[in-house]
Amino acid sequence: MAGAYREETRPKAIAQGTKIPIPVAENQAMGDSRSMNPTIPQGMLEPARHVPVARETDVLVCGGGPAGIAAAFTAARAGARVLILERHPFLGGVWTAGALTILIDTEHKDGLNREIRRRLEKRGAATYCGLWPDWPVYGLEAMKALLDEMVEETGVEVQYYTTVAAVAREGRRISGVFTESKSGREFVRAKVIIDATGDGDVAAQAGCEFKLGRPGDGKTQPMTLYGRIGGYTGGPVHVQPLLDIAINAGVQPSYGDVTLFPQPGQPGVFLLMATHLYGNALDVRDLTRAEMQGRAEIRKLVDLYRRHAGPDWKNVYLIDTGPFLGVRESRRILGRHYLTVEELKAGKTFEDGICHVRFIADIHHPDPSEGSGLTHVFFPAYDIPYRCLIARDVDNLMMAGRCISGDHIAFASYRVTGDAIAMGEAAALCVKHGIDPDDVHRPELLAELAKMRTTEWTSPAC
């Protein structure tokens, strides 16, 4: 399988402060094939301006999804000052903004994986369904509330409605990031930066090399928009009849299947997964089109089931769609090690292994012409080495989550949220020693990681 693939490296991004010729044909420079209007200037020089230093912190976590919250909570519990920058008004990333509602590949993991599972179960906000009996399905609002509580308990600072606009790079180090929010452009200074954006936005802005998509054509796995439906009055749901109804009506779900996740404590409410939305998650035009297509497809399916799925479905309605698209794949930042499918085939373990992965390679077909649905490739359990989390091109930058260093197929296995949490925990521990990530003594790091994952964290809410 690996022999059929050829990896291609994407061009480096332009680091902050690099001089470039003006005008710049920006679309052409990025390899965009869209035609350009010759009457429109090809580039503009943004005026220089004074940017205030708004904050200073030990650890800056960019992105508050599963990897980001794990990094932040772990670093704070180790005594560091931590700030999370998050574009949404809540934490959780794909758990909440993406409305995933299921914890994947957490069942064999301790640490924060275990803590979050137990705390959701204790408040009746997690349940188990027959489709994946080892993976808890959780309530969206319950997850938001739990993460808010953990922020208060750990003392982590959070700034919502904020995106990273640029980085300040000096040689092989980043001194901080420029942010954009309703407060305007600001600067945050930090000793260590953890890129938990999912898309590797910070690393790309710092000029780190990355790979995007599968070898050859660079296409990425499709995105998914979830819909939350209510009004069902029957018993256990069998999804095959729902798929048959859609196919017979000529409304083939783009996902190739229909999946329903029952919401804990909400009778008759389900999360509907039925969409595959194709495009580049780094292109705002593709994101816009995918959002609109996803909403239209979900509305059509819900209307179809209300009219044709029987009396238990006659009052079904669409409550809402996910606040944000669930993105499966975008940049993979090159680190100090590049995890390959050959290493997965061998069930490779590493001296600096920070996460043991048991999940399959879950490859959703990147091109609709290849048919809807997905391909599963099974591997023996393997390790993610700590070096995959350290940016190759910047000394004080780490990645956690799906943007770490690995090939297209390996990525399809380790991208799930249970592994993202484990990566976040590991990324945070270097701060305890006050040194760059690559200078950490590996055996000591692994010993601390193992101790942390087997120690119960006590708080008033537990």
Regions found by a protein language model. Name each.
Residues 57, 67, 96, 186:
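Ligand-binding pocket scaffold of soluble enzyme catalytic domains
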Residues 37-41, 45-50, 94, 161, ...:
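Flavin (FAD/FMN)-binding glycine-rich loop and adjacent Rossmann-like elements that form
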Residues 59-80:
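N-terminal Rossmann-like FAD-binding beta1-loop-alpha1 element of flavoenzymes
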Residues 17-19, 27, 31-59:
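Extreme N-terminal leader/targeting segments of oxidoreductases
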Residues 168-187:
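Conserved beta-strand-loop-beta-strand element in the redox core of flavoprotein oxidoreductases
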